[in-house]
Amino acid sequence: MNVLSYSINPLKGLYAISGVEVGQHFYWQIGGFQIHGQVLITSWVVIAILLGSAAIAVRSPQTIPTGGQNFFEYVLEFIRDVSKTQIGEEYRPWVPFIGTMFLFIFVSNWSGALLPWKIIQLPHGELAAPTNDINTTVALALLTSVAYFYAGLTKKGLGYFGKYIQPTPILLPINILEDFTKPLSLSFRLFGNILADELVVVVLVSLVPLVVPIPVMFLGLFTSGIQALIFATLAAAYIGESLEGHH
């Protein structure tokens, strides 16, 4: 009985820690679950922007691209280059995944600076970039983990797990730990940079509302784009490692 109560108490403690929040959040109650409504709202807006832009740009494709079609073809070529550089000759099936990651993160990051989220009033909390929430970045990182496991298992089958004892079985714990640190580093890097950028802008606007925050906002747009590129590049690199079967 004592052993059972001892095992339950730590679980309660972990559950309490997981409920710790930074700021206020707007929740939707669905069944027995609480869902961050503000994250879903902003994510849907970003997805609508991406789908709407793509539909408008390619609604009447031309042999010689112009305007929006030309821009989207340039973006596609850029994503192909990133995928091919990191993955190798087997990059083609992974272009849609890498492209989706890059575009969603890029538009999400920029939406925090360019879209007037503050205009929309919520009962609790406020709207912000989807990548400003740790839930979004963790979900993206876990999708990346699933992708590179799928890539390795599809190509090598169960032999994929042989990489954990290469070049020597002594490295087994370190190789296993690496698979846990990859999604952690991806998610916290993106979340930390976007949150810090928005906090700096908010503080500067409150202290010096004119002129001074503008250069910081432009710097934030630049770093937001870089963060999207870093995430997509690392995702492609992890997939490439799984396909090659070495570190």
From Swiss-Prot:
Keywords, comma-separated and alphabetical: ATP synthesis, CF(0), Chloroplast, Hydrogen ion transport, Ion transport, Membrane, Plastid, Thylakoid, Transmembrane, Transmembrane helix, Transport
Localization of this protein: Plastid, Chloroplast thylakoid membrane
A GO cellular component entry from the record: plasma membrane
GO MF term set: proton-transporting ATP synthase activity, rotational mechanism
One Pfam family of this chain: ATP-synt_A
Organism domain of life: Eukaryota
Coiled-coil annotated residue ranges, if any: none
Membrane topology: Multi-pass membrane protein
InterPro entries in alphabetical order: ATP_syn_F0_a_bact/chloroplast (IPR045082), ATP_synth_F0_asu (IPR000568), ATP_synth_F0_asu_AS (IPR023011), F0_ATP_A_sf (IPR035908)
Subunit structure: F-type ATPases have 2 components, CF(1) - the catalytic core - and CF(0) - the membrane proton channel. CF(1) has five subunits: alpha(3), beta(3), gamma(1), delta(1), epsilon(1). CF(0) has four main subunits: a, b, b' and c.
Protein family per UniProt: Belongs to the ATPase A chain family.
Protein name per Swiss-Prot or TrEMBL: ATP synthase subunit a, chloroplastic
Organism: Spinacia oleracea
Gene name of the record: atpI
